[in-house]
């Protein structure tokens, strides 16, 4: 039975799962959505990307999907055999998904020039009939989400200062590397952070790119993981 990943790699969560599949060398197909209705069709539980067909089941949520992949193919493992390190890896994965993600969202949707670039990037692969709907609804809807989350209420200079502090903290957690918590193999934490750093380091968010470029250690980390999962 074919393993199918549903979602577009512009999403850091789809990228996270894509890299996990590549790391484990699991053959799969990728189906990209052609509009918002495909999201609900592919993932009726949450209506979000990614979703994955695996072993006869339709899975959702990047964290749950990676957990299932570790059971489906245990090697290479996505968690350290050392329980304290594994606990830290789980926490970092959750932080990247639930906190760092929103810095990228604010930079994309709360700065008008970036919003224009983001919509152009999203719409280029969508059917023409869907594009006006995305252009009309997405900016207002997503910007309201960032304000409800909290980061969207911050002045840009404060947001960038906080982002810089978090990136500096990531360098400390990377330690001697090559992967987070000085481990020799990538884990769920590395996959999650990689996805979010790529989300920040994008032509549509020059502020995010500049923030990440300050830390050569993070760029080198991304290059290492990319080489293992490309």
Report each predicted region and the residues it spans.
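GST-like domain detector, emphasizing the conserved glutathione-binding G-site
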Residues: 1-132
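Residues within well-ordered alpha-helical secondary structure of globular protein domains
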Residues: 71, 95, 197, 224-227
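Structural signal for well-ordered, non-membrane alpha-helices
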Residues: 97, 167-171, 226
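GST-like fold's C-terminal all-alpha helical module
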Residues: 102-213, 217
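Intrinsically disordered, low-complexity polar regions and short flexible loop motifs
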Residues: 218-224
